[in-house]
Amino acid sequence: MAEHGSRVSLHGFNNLTKSLSFNIYDVCYAKTAEQRHAYIEYIDEVYNAERLTQILTDVADIIGANILNIARQDYEPQGASVTILISEEPVSEAVAEAADQVGPGPLPETVLGHLDKSHITVHTYPESHPDHGVSTFRADIDVSTCGVISPLKALNYLIHSFDSDIVTMDYRVRGFTRDVRGRKHFIDHDINSIQNYLADDTKERYHTIDVNVFQENLFHTKMMVRELDLENYLFGESAGNLEPAERREIERQLRREMTEIFAGRNLAPDQEV
C-alpha cells in the first residue's frame, strides 16, 4: 500500500466510493398532547424540503461537488426527503439548468446515466411517545461520493445544521482504484477514526465512542451530548414554571430517551441512567 500522504498517479478515474451516513436525533419534552402535536408541526416546518435542499446544496459546495439534479418532497402528515445527484467534474450548461428545476425525481433511464456519479440524500422522521412527553426528531443523511472528493469535509457542517443530541455516523470506503503500474488501492487517505474530522468544540460537547473495522475500511462513531440544559429541551413550557421534583423527572425521562437511542436498546424500567 502506498503512503496516503503522497499523491498516487492513477490509471484513469478514481473509482473509490466513499460513503458517510448520519442518523441525527433531536430530543424534546412536550408535556401535553397539544404541545406534542405543535412540536411535530414546528419541526416539520423548520426542516421542510426547501430548508433541507439548502443544507444539502451547501454540503455539495463544501465537498467541491457539482450538482446534476435535485428532487425533493414534503410528506403528509409529516416528514420530508431530498435527493441530489452530484458529480466531481464540472457539468454542462444544459445539465446545470436542469439541476435548477425541482421535480419528482429522475426517470429510470436518467438514473442509469448517472450510476457512476455520487449523491446526497436526507429523510426526516418526527415522532413522539404515545403516553409521555418525550418527542424525537430524526434525520437520516447519506453523502456518497465517487472520485477524489470526500464527504468527510461536510461532517461538522451537518452536525451544526441540526439540533443534534445524538449522532450515529458510519463511514466506509468501497471498491478500488489502480495506479499507473496496475496496483490496486482500496483507500486513498489516512483515517483511524471519524473523530479525526470533528472540530474541537464538537468533541468537547459530545461523549463519543468508536467501533471500527480497519481491515474493511469501515468506521463507526456514536455521539451523545454531555450537558442537558432543561430549558433548551422544553417545548411550550419554561423550566422556571416547574416544581423541582417535576424538573428532575423530566430530566430523567430525557436522559433515558437519549441513552436508549445512543445504546440502541431499551433499558429496564428500574435501570438508572
UniProtKB/Swiss-Prot annotation:
Gene Ontology, cellular component aspect: cytosol
Enzyme Commission number(s): 4.1.1.50
Quaternary structure and interacting proteins, as annotated: Heterooctamer of four alpha and four beta chains arranged as a tetramer of alpha/beta heterodimers.
Site (Cleavage (non-hydrolytic)): K117, S118
Catalytic activity from the UniProt record: S-adenosyl-L-methionine + H(+) = S-adenosyl 3-(methylsulfanyl)propylamine + CO2
GO molecular function terms noted in the UniProt entry: adenosylmethionine decarboxylase activity
Family: Belongs to the prokaryotic AdoMetDC family. Type 2 subfamily.
Native source species: Alkalilimnicola ehrlichii (strain ATCC BAA-1101 / DSM 17681 / MLHE-1)
PTM: Is synthesized initially as an inactive proenzyme. Formation of the active enzyme involves a self-maturation process in which the active site pyruvoyl group is generated from an internal serine residue via an autocatalytic post-translational modification. Two non-identical subunits are generated from the proenzyme in this reaction, and the pyruvate is formed at the N-terminus of the alpha chain, which is derived from the carboxyl end of the proenzyme.
Enzyme class: lyase
Lineage, broadest ranks: Bacteria, Pseudomonadati, Pseudomonadota, Gammaproteobacteria, Chromatiales
Superkingdom as given in the UniProt entry: Bacteria
Annotated gene: speD
GO terms, biological process: spermidine biosynthetic process
Main function: Catalyzes the decarboxylation of S-adenosylmethionine to S-adenosylmethioninamine (dcAdoMet), the propylamine donor required for the synthesis of the polyamines spermine and spermidine from the diamine putrescine.
The entry's keywords: Autocatalytic cleavage, Decarboxylase, Lyase, Polyamine biosynthesis, Pyruvate, S-adenosyl-L-methionine, Schiff base, Spermidine biosynthesis, Zymogen
Record-linked Gene3D superfamilies: S-adenosylmethionine decarboxylase (3.60.90.10)
Residue numbers annotated as active site: S118 (schiff-base intermediate with substrate), H123 (proton acceptor), C146 (proton donor)
Residue numbers of Pyruvic acid (Ser) PTMs: S118
Cofactor(s) the record lists: pyruvate
Protein name: S-adenosylmethionine decarboxylase proenzyme
Note accompanying the cofactor annotation: Binds 1 pyruvoyl group covalently per subunit.
Biochemical pathway: Amine and polyamine biosynthesis; S-adenosylmethioninamine biosynthesis; S-adenosylmethioninamine from S-adenosyl-L-methionine: step 1/1
